[in-house]
Amino acid sequence: MSIGTQTHRNLALFATLAVLWGTSFMAIEVGLEVLPPALFAALRYDVAGAVLFIYGLLAAEDWRPRGRDEWVVVGIGGTLLIGAHFALLFSGQRYVTSGVAAIVLSTSPILTPLFAWSMLPDERLDAGGFVGVFLGLVGTVVIALSSGSVGGQLAGVVLLFLAAVSWAFGTVLVKRLPGNPPVVPMQSWMMLLGAGLLHVVSPVLGEPGLTTVAWSPLVVAALLFLAVLCSAAGFIIYFVLLDRIGAIEINLVSYAVPIVAALSGWAFLGEQIGSATVAGFVFILSGFALMKRRALAPFVYGLCVRTGVVALRLVGDHDPASTHDSAPADD
């Protein structure tokens, strides 16, 4: 396979992932019309976990974690990355638009290095990193207070920000633990455990049960879209891209997702997004760019070379004038 073909396939997978995860917020909005948030999230990961578990079996993966360390990883991940994260996400999205929800959640890649700095001895956060975290927080505050809202939208933004915190903290904690189970079985068990916890939390929060849900073809379609495509298939695409293009470039999908979410919410749900929300997104994106400036530099340079913005300078190339100046004098 040629490099060009591989690049085009990677771009197609990246775009597919951005579209799936971006439109997931629209599907959540549809489901929340009739489903309580924790129960909705539980049903999503009942199905997603089962699909991914079957995929792991067909792919000849080890079907379950082995030993205490691997089960601890599954327990922490299921609690923080699935249970807490999606309970907060679905609850928060009741109060805000799809675009706002996606933008607030895009603070996760900014918060993750902050937790890593405090919990992982090899991680360091310099002054630029702290400024990046600050910009991300400023962006979140701008969005929370946009349109003069200090009621429902503020509550929604706070819940969504806590969802981002849960994801970032859980990611670092899982990385810190010694267990290293196979990826697909680990994720499927995390999803199933998280779904079980959400089923427990739902009645504790006073949510009505399944018998009260006014099911419709649209709601069923939204649930299956979220579970099968956004969660199970999206997870597989994510790890394929992670292996092919690396962590920095795949993290950029976090900033394509809010654009897709805002556009899909506007096109299909009639949602509007104000200038203050756009400004908040710019703050968050700037914070991420500042934190990852060194890692992003080779990617940006390569992108500029591929698009012809800058010319590729090969080792040994010299400016003609400098070559003339440095040439030895005639004897």
Regions inferred by a protein language model and the residue ranges of each:
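Membrane-interface interhelical linkers
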Residues: 1-16, 50-76, 122-130, 148-154, ...
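Hydrophobic residues within alpha-helical transmembrane segments
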Residues: 12, 16, 42-50, 72, ...
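Specific transmembrane alpha-helical segments of multi-pass solute transporters/efflux pumps
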Residues: 20, 24-25, 53-105, 111, ...
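Transmembrane alpha-helices of multi-pass small-molecule transport proteins
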Residues: 32-84, 109-115, 166-170, 187-207, ...
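Helix-capping/transition residues at the boundaries of transmembrane alpha-helices
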Residues: 32-33, 93-95, 120, 178, ...
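Specific alpha-helical transmembrane segments that line the substrate/conduction pathway
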Residues: 39-49, 81, 89-123, 133, ...
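Helix-helix packing/entry segments at the starts of transmembrane helices
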Residues: 43, 101-107, 172-196, 227-267
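Hydrophobic transmembrane alpha-helices of multi-pass small-molecule transport proteins
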Residues: 107-109, 115, 125-147, 264, ...
